[in-house]
Amino acid sequence: MTRIKRGYIARRRRTKIRLFASSFRGAHSRLTRTITQQRIRALVSAHRDRGRKKRDFRRLWITRINAVIRGDGVSYSYNRFIHNLYKKQLLLNRKILAQIAISNRSCLYTISNEIRK
């Protein structure tokens, strides 16, 4: 059997992985085995947190809207506000409503008073 000379392929692969892990601390940026383990772990975390970010932002928007709505009227909640929005066919998503709640509260109060009728 003839000998297969791989040249610099393995070194190129390792340097590519090292570049990925260059900002890691300690052995996680120096030793090849730990670099590969940490790389897998980092990519798993990134994949998981991309989905998680969507949930977290939705929760934040709902919290902001609810805080402003409850400040307007004590007996009025986020749940009723969204329900009335759908009944009146005002299609504003939660992100936009949260931005309105932060930047222009009087506008959100106007919207809530209009749909409450």
From Swiss-Prot:
Keyword Chloroplast in record: yes
InterPro entries: Ribosomal_bL20 (IPR005813), RIBOSOMAL_L20_CS (IPR049946), Ribosomal_protein_bL20_C (IPR035566)
GO cellular component terms attached to this protein's record: chloroplast; ribonucleoprotein complex; ribosome
Cellular compartment(s): Plastid, Chloroplast
A Gene Ontology molecular function term of the record: rRNA binding
Swiss-Prot/TrEMBL keywords: Chloroplast, Plastid, Ribonucleoprotein, Ribosomal protein, RNA-binding, rRNA-binding
GO BP, sorted A to Z: ribosomal large subunit assembly; translation
Source superkingdom: Eukaryota
Pfam families: Ribosomal_L20
Function: Binds directly to 23S ribosomal RNA and is necessary for the in vitro assembly process of the 50S ribosomal subunit. It is not involved in the protein synthesizing functions of that subunit.
UniProt family annotation: Belongs to the bacterial ribosomal protein bL20 family.
Protein name: Large ribosomal subunit protein bL20c
Source organism (scientific name): Carica papaya (Papaya)
